Regions:
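Short acidic, glycine-rich surface-loop motifs adjacent to enzyme active sites
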Residues: 11-15, 140-160
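Histidine-centered catalytic micro-motifs
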Residues: 151-156, 187-195
């Protein structure tokens, strides 16, 4: 990034674990194998090395929460680790508006939306969600925009098996923005561990692969 002299960098989540990976609230029978391995990793083994290198970049740098940031800590702890004030936000750069979303919420047994927290989300399949307040905020951001828009998220923003459970609410909002002449140009996510290009309503949705590739 330094050599290419890019205008900014952003990581799209599942980027770093906290230093201590010994505490997880997920029931053992629901726990995926990668969490079990992480829990066995000694605290003294560096886990923030890549994050520290990322933060050395001399130009603007931005973070986004993935689900795995909350495997061994609360969402508040994950935000603190990345120096983020809020889990979703927007920024402007060189005539573009960039929107960063947070899809790390699930519905509990009472039907309430709950933040991912110490791996507890692995006990349910009713996920992921954008919260109602976030959707209201996003609608205001889109309808007040005067610049072309790029949306970043961890989970896909189009209908697919690993995408948002309330993707219809999001897509309705996007269609409303497009009908109002708002220039939503591009949406980018990861989470799926594959490279995917998806076109819908004139918008390119790009899923970025992971270093570990598909598994």
């Amino acid at each position: 990034a330094q050599k290419a002299d890019v205008d900014f960098i952003i990581q799209l989540g599942d980027f770093s674990y906290p230093k201590d990976t010994s505490t997880c609230l997920c029931a053992p029978e629901k726990m995926p194998i990668n969490l079990k391995y992480a829990m066995e990793c000694p605290t003294e083994i560096p886990k923030l090395e890549i994050l520290n290198k990322f933060n050395l970049f001399s130009k603007p740098k931005y973070h986004l929460l993935g689900n795995h940031e909350c495997d061994f800590c609360s969402k508040a702890d994950a935000l603190e680790m990345y120096g983020m004030e809020k889990p979703y936000y927007s920024f402007h750069l060189k005539g573009w508006q960039f929107i960063v979303l947070d899809g790390n919420s699930y519905r509990d047994e009472h039907g309430d939306l709950v933040d991912y927290n110490f791996g507890k989300y692995f006990e349910t399949t009713d996920l992921p969600y954008l919260g109602e307040q976030q959707l209201v905020w996003l609608r205001e951001e889109v309808l007040s925009a005067t610049e072309p828009i790029v949306i970043f998220s961890h989970q896909p923003l189009y209908a697919c098996p690993r995408g948002l459970r309330n993707v219809d609410d999001l897509q309705k909002l996007i269609r409303e923005g497009r009908a109002a002449g708002k220039r939503i140009q591009f949406c980018m996510n990861c989470h799926v561990h594959r490279d995917i290009r998806h076109f819908e309503n004139g918008i390119l949705y790009y899923t970025l692969n992971s270093i570990s590739n598909y598994w």
